[in-house]
């Protein structure tokens, strides 16, 4: 029997890096609400009560980025030093400039072209309903549930910062059981750790992970140091784009290296990543293969991909040449086509910033639809 263990992690929206992703995407959405052709690349850094926002923007929109940032931080749940960030004492530095004209002349044409060179990957597997690796799906579900029990006071004494991790045992390539679960939950100084562990097992872990995946030897680690009373930006510096594996496939497949948050869809890092996932997911949903990874590469100022690579990890049920042919016929992989077909010039990005850009079923996540599977099936023959 071929047996191995794979681990994935996720974080709550209160994790310092995710706070920054949320701020970046909230700012992006505000620009897109007023001007759908906005060119935006905004990043930020948060530490203690300091927030630095920087980037390049070309837009007719007028956005109060400081106001957007503070509102986002409040929505997450930060308010005081003890919670991790005191919005009343925040120091905000901004440095936002216009997009380089050298870049703009390659992007702003009759048809939108790539705003930079780069390679991206999309991945899909049929091992879960979301077509995500199961460990990644479970990690996101745990982090989302951890946030829910805090916001709804199902578990008292929690603050926004938190993390989850799932180690999953595979047998002959199929998920078998959970080896371990890790939760980190930022809490009030007065919170009893034994009570917290009991509550999180009952209200988070047992609500998310099916009992069929739990074994007697499954280990659970909650705030493993014994205390997590100092958290959020008060404990750790946060930075936009530092959770790219959490954002994607939890360590399965490959990553082109480019982060998503704060970038408008003319940036191939974002739009082409969404398209590569869309392609991979539809190929798996059409039952052409059990697993699929799609690489797309682009050149700045060019409309169409420089290269397309499809890896089915030996699970293909049709000749790979046929799969390539069908992919090219069904999907418009030009940057302009991606933006139009996935309707990416809308203010939809704040929702993507936490709990993964993939495996979601909200209407905004057009790249998660499997609406091309029937066309693929008809063409494959």
Region spans (language model):
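A short glycine-rich, hydrophobically flanked beta-strand micro-motif that places a catalytic Asp/Glu
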Residues: 38-42, 162-168, 218-222, 288-299
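Alpha-helical support elements that line or immediately flank enzyme active sites
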Residues: 13-32, 128-144, 263-287
């Amino acid at each position: 029997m071929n047996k191995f263990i794979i681990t994935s992690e996720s974080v709550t929206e209160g994790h310092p890096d995710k706070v920054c992703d949320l701020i970046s995407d909230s700012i992006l959405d505000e620009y897109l609400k007023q001007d759908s052709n906005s060119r935006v690349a905004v990043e930020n850094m948060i530490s203690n009560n300091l927030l630095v926002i920087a980037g390049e923007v070309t837009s007719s929109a007028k956005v109060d980025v400081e106001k957007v940032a503070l509102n986002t931080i409040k929505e997450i749940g930060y308010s005081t030093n003890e919670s991790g960030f005191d919005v009343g004492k925040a120091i905000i530095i901004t440095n936002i400039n216009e997009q380089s004209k050298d870049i703009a002349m390659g992007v702003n044409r009759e048809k939108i072209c790539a705003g930079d060179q780069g390679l991206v990957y999309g991945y899909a597997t049929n091992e879960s309903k979301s077509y995500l690796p199961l460990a990644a799906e479970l990690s996101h579900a745990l982090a989302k549930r951890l946030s829910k029990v805090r916001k709804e006071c199902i578990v008292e004494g929690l603050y926004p910062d938190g993390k989850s991790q799932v180690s999953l045992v595979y047998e002959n390539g199929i998920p078998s059981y959970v080896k371990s679960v890790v939760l980190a939950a930022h809490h009030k100084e007065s919170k009893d750790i034994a009570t917290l562990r009991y509550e999180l097992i009952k209200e988070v872990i047992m609500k998310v992970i099916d009992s069929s995946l739990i074994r007697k030897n499954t280990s659970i680690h909650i705030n493993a140091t014994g205390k997590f009373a100092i958290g959020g930006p008060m404990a750790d510096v946060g930075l936009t784009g530092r959770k790219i594996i959490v954002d994607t496939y939890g360590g399965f497949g490959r990553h082109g290296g480019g982060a998503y948050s704060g970038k408008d869809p003319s940036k191939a890092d974002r739009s082409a990543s969404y398209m590569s996932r869309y392609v991979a997911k539809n190929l798996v949903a059409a039952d052409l293969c059990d697993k699929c990874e799609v690489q797309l590469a682009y050149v700045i100022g060019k409309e169409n991909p420089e290269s397309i690579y499809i890896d089915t990890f030996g699970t293909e049920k049709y000749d790979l040449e046929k799969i390539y042919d069908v992919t090219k016929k069904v999907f418009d992989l030009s940057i302009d086509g991606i933006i139009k077909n996935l309707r990416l010039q809308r203010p939809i990005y704040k929702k993507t910033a936490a709990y993964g850009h993939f495996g979601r079923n909200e209407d905004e996540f057009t790249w998660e639809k499997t609406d091309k599977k029937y066309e693929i099936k008809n063409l494959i023959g």
